[in-house]
Amino acid sequence: MIRFFFKRSCLLCLALYVVGTVNGAEVNTTSLAVTGDAVATLPPKENLLLPGETFHVVNHAAFVMLPEGVKSSRPQPWIWYCITRFTGPNYPDHHEKWMHEQFISAGIAVAGVDVGESFGSPRGRKVFDAFYQEMTVNRGFASKPCMFGRSRGGLQASSWAIENAEKVAGIGGFYPVFDLRGYPGLQQAAPAYEMTVQELEAALPRLNPVARLHVLAKAGVPAFFIHGDVDQVVTLEENTAAFIATYEANGAKDIVGLIVAKGQGHNYWPGFFRCRELIDFVISRAGQGAIDSR
């Protein structure tokens, strides 16, 4: 059992707990498409979980799901969702619909850009830079979104946040990846980084998010996650537990939280998608990001 409590006044004070056990199938996350330069096919907005729009950012398909009255709320608070995919399987997917409804109902927009299986690589981060510019400068959204990482989306969210800590209001998600060595593994990640396995291994101290999480801790970026204790795809110990340990070692234990889902793996258990504590945290941080942007 792992228990953490938020103490900083700007956060919701959440007492965390271990959730129950439900069986679920492991998620297949082995697609290896690497970020490309060709113009991506733009999916129709009707394919989104909730009302919004789709658009291009430097040839990459992007989306935003908007709350009602978005034009009257400036700057617009928003959640930056990772991993966004428009080619099977699509993310965000239908399992997350209720969660995103909570975000939208709270007046928080949700947006993301498809950078393929970039695994947090510099090439993918360049697209993220352009997406951030589009959302904040061109569309008037808050300059500090809350990052959200699902599974390997954690690599994308954390790697960009580490390079742009002053532009991030918080980071949350469920069973997120922070260590390239476990998932996807260096063999699979190397092409996305445009390196050989040996080159990537040598560059891990400066490229692997888990080796650089101290940047977020020292910058005071709040974080909250839920992760299963029997996850064999993205292990708790190598990823979110390592995240927590880094925050603790850098004097930031009061701004990080983790719910350990007892008996859960890398699956579609509803508790991951309906975690009230995670949802409240993300809404709170996105809202604070809009306040800080004024």
Task: Please identify what each model-predicted range represents.
Residues 73-84:
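Short beta-strand element of the alpha/beta-hydrolase
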Residues 136-138, 142-191:
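Primarily recognizes the serine-hydrolase "nucleophile elbow" in alpha/beta-hydrolase
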Residues 237-294:
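C-terminal catalytic histidine-bearing segment of alpha/beta-hydrolase fold enzymes
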Residues 9-21:
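Bacterial N-terminal signal peptides
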Residues 70, 181-248:
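The feature captures the conserved acid-bearing segment of alpha/beta-hydrolase catalytic domains
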Residues 91-110:
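Short amphipathic alpha-helix adjacent to the substrate-entry channel of hydrolases
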Residues 119-140, 159:
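Alpha/beta-hydrolase active-site loop
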Residues 24-74, 189-192, 287-294:
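A domain-start/cap signature at the N-terminus of enzymes
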